[in-house]
Amino acid sequence: MAMLAQTPPMGFNTWNTFGPNINEQMMLEITDVMVERGYRDAGYKYVVIDDCWSMRERNENGELVADPEKFPHGMKFIADYVHSKGLKFGMYSCAGIRTCAGFPSSFDHEYQDARTFASWGVDFLKYDWCFDEAQSPQGAYR
C-alpha cells in the first residue's frame, strides 16, 4: 500500500537565487550549507540544479550532456557528493522542445533522458512546461 509523504519535497533549488549562473563548486557549497546549518536535519532533503546546466545541444548519441565549463566532473560527481551528505539530488528538465531558458529538453527523448538521469543518480526531477504549445499536459501524459 502506498503511503503519503509526511512533508512535501523540501530543499534548495538554484533558479530563484542564481538563475543561469550555476556551477559545480556552487553546488558542493550549497550541499555543505544544507548540512552545516541544520537544514537537512530539519527535513530539507533535496539539492536541485535548475535550468542552464547542460550544453546547448545534445551529443552525437542524442544524450543530454552537462556543460563541462560549469560542471567539469559531471552530474554523477555532484550526485555522489550530495548523497554522501545524506541528501537527495534533483535536476531540471522540460516537456517542451526546449527548456524555458532555451537548452535541450526532454521532448521526444523522455525515455533516454530518464535513463541518463538514473545513471547519474538523480532522485528528483523538476519538470517544466515551456515551448510546448502543440499539446496539452493531459494529452502528453497519456
Question: Where are each of the predicted segments found?
Answer:
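Short N-terminal amphipathic alpha-helix/helix-capping patch enriched in small hydrophobics
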Residues: 8, 23, 27-30
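Metal-dependent phosphate/diphosphate-handling catalytic cores characterized by acidic Asp/Glu clusters
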Residues: 4-5, 26-27, 73
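Second-shell loop/turn segments in exported
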Residues: 15-22, 66-68
